[in-house]
Amino acid sequence: MASTVEGGDTALLPEFPRGPLDAYRARASFSWKELALFTEGEGMLRFKKTIFSALENDPLFARSPGADLSLEKYRELNFLRCKRIFEYDFLSVEDMFKSPLKVPALIQCLGMYDSSLAAKYLLHSLVFGSAVYSSGSERHLTYIQKIFRMEIFGCFALTELSHGSNTKAIRTTAHYDPATEEFIIHSPDFEAAKFWVGNMGKTATHAVVFAKLCVPGDQCHGLHPFIVQIRDPKTLLPMPGVMVGDIGKKLGQNGLDNGFAMFHKVRVPRQSLLNRMGDVTPEGTYVSPFKDVRQRFGASLGSLSSGRVSIVSLAILNLKLAVAIALRFSATRRQFGPTEEEEIPVLEYPMQQWRLLPYLAAVYALDHFSKSLFLDLVELQRGLASGDRSARQAELGREIHALASASKPLASWTTQQGIQECREACGGHGYLAMNRLGVLRDDNDPNCTYEGDNNILLQQTSNYLLGLLAHQVHDGACFRSPLKSVDFLDAYPGILDQKFEVSSVADCLDSAVALAAYKWLVCYLLRETYQKLNQEKRSGSSDFEARNKCQVSHGRPLALAFVELTVVQRFHEHVHQPSVPPSLRAVLGRLSALYALWSLSRHAALLYRGGYFSGEQAGEVLESAVLALCSQLKDDAVALVDVIAPPDFVLDSPIGRADGELYKNLWGAVLQESKVLERASWWPEFSVNKPVIGSLKSKL
């Protein structure tokens, strides 16, 4: 496959324009085309190229430099573009099942063009669509057809004005009326209004509404999803009893219409209940295929993880763009040098390498992890769709919930910090809006809070781990999970006896070193958190109080260390598999080691506190290894960016273009701005209407 491309298949992977980046491209230790083929595969590369080419050649997607669209116009344009994506039909339902990784690939392509477009398409097709598919049954298949024909437009309505992360406190109700075989969807007051719901503001015709299901006799069975029509598809006017509107302008992603809805005794057919987890008979009896409440809860958790798993991919695409812009800039921006006559690229400075290259490694590690986690989610959803009610299926749901709940914070925070570092690493030019880093920062920011506040989600993961340890302590159970993310904990007493014994930088340049340290760290934090929790309870704290007292210094770092270990483990295994071409092993090994050691270095205090590290040498070796790996990857940085960067039209950043003509591109873009050379329309305010100094000063 690689030889075909190297032999001249420039249609798939065309050569880059000659220019200032040539020197770095020539120094790369590997072929960027070979790495692209290994990472993506030829079929996926062709799929992405089809999408990018369609967008670039379609006038509807034309870039408008300097255009300041009104909120209304941006929303309209984003909807028209979303509709056009359906007209292109890049990914059929059949293709989704055949090649599931094309789903996040499509979302990444759209998100690289505009996060608002990706969010709008994702919320309708995948979040709304997968909720109906995985939580519904055969009676809901007609909705699936309408979703992908865009005959209806959907949204996912869980959050309320006064409650988001605390889903148990959601107050929307669904009372069943056996006389009419209908559910009555009701918002008791404005605080129970569904709020922040993407697509609900102006366009959604249907919503998956989460409400407390109650049957006659005041028996309530917790939150269940219902498909509820909120607007007439023919007029987009609200349905009777539904008050629906837009919440207004946001900090970013303003092409997406986030909205609210209140329901005043809205009657929907009994069949509106998405009944995979539980159903109500015509007479009003609640039934569930899950006899064990814990199994039902585990399965439902997994079905709700699709949004969080998608956000991991959305966050990473923003980091890909930011890193591509900053590293191409750094390779062409020359400042200072060993002599006054010779300036060198800022990428040659160890400080710039240390600031940016760990985020490049993070892109590769987290991107691989997000794909693998998506495939895990696909396995779960296929089990749900086939009616698998096994204990393994429920446990898979709980494990994916734990991984998604921690990987969303990790990915969104890493991207948040990475974009800011990229912005600053580009100096003043990074602050110029046309170079896109500010837009990326604002568009990524909601990833930190929607689908669950990051810090709250981390508690979900730490609770999962604490529950496993409690089960082991009280029942002698082994640590086992379907995806094997916790299996290493079975050996935790022996792991805790280990120490960091690497004494040289050379011996530290392997992700296996960080893997061993991470396993110790997770075992240590799990033990310490468990002991702290029990100590707080013995001191009189309730379970609620005890968990909150443990979270800051114990539970939070436990959850982050666990998910970082999982990311490092999966990427380490990926880059060390036998199928890796020999010519790529060195660069992939360095990326894996850099991400692992850089991530681990942020836990140095805990490693010392627990006794895994001792003396100055351990910390110095770790720090020196990170710097050494940055230096080793410096000459490969531009080629590594070439693998992940979209075409210039999509990247849309003058300082990040593939030709490396930094100043030519930036100067040209500045001169193309609207009215850039015209005097201000309010020029008479200076030239004619002079101020009368002191005329407004108080006479008292």
From Swiss-Prot:
InterPro entries linked to this entry: ACO, ACOX_C_alpha1, Acyl-CoA_Oxase/DH_mid-dom, Acyl-CoA_Oxase/DH_mid-dom_sf, Acyl-CoA_oxidase, Acyl-CoA_oxidase_C, AcylCo_DH-like_C, AcylCoA_DH/oxidase_NM_dom_sf
Location in the cell: Peroxisome
Known pathway: Lipid metabolism; peroxisomal fatty acid beta-oxidation
Domain of life: Eukaryota
Cofactor dependence: FAD
Modified residues (N-acetylalanine): A2
GO cellular component: cytosol; membrane; peroxisomal matrix; peroxisome
GO annotation terms (biological process): fatty acid beta-oxidation using acyl-CoA oxidase
TM stretches of this protein: none
Residue numbers of Phosphothreonine PTMs: T281
EC number: 1.3.3.6
Pfam families hit by this protein: ACOX, ACOX_C_alpha1, Acyl-CoA_dh_M
Motif Microbody targeting signal, chain ranges: 698-700
Keywords attached to this entry: Acetylation, FAD, Fatty acid metabolism, Flavoprotein, Lipid metabolism, Oxidoreductase, Peroxisome, Phosphoprotein
Main location: other
Catalysis: reaction(s): a 2,3-saturated acyl-CoA + O2 = a (2E)-enoyl-CoA + H2O2; (2S)-pristanoyl-CoA + O2 = (2E)-pristenoyl-CoA + H2O2; tetracosanoyl-CoA + O2 = (2E)-tetracosenoyl-CoA + H2O2; hexadecanoyl-CoA + O2 = (2E)-hexadecenoyl-CoA + H2O2
GO MF terms held by the record: FAD binding; fatty acid binding; flavin adenine dinucleotide binding; pristanoyl-CoA oxidase activity
Family membership: Belongs to the acyl-CoA oxidase family.
Role of this protein: Oxidizes the CoA-esters of 2-methyl-branched fatty acids.
Name used for this protein in its record: Peroxisomal acyl-coenzyme A oxidase 3
Organism lineage: Eukaryota, Metazoa, Chordata, Craniata, Vertebrata
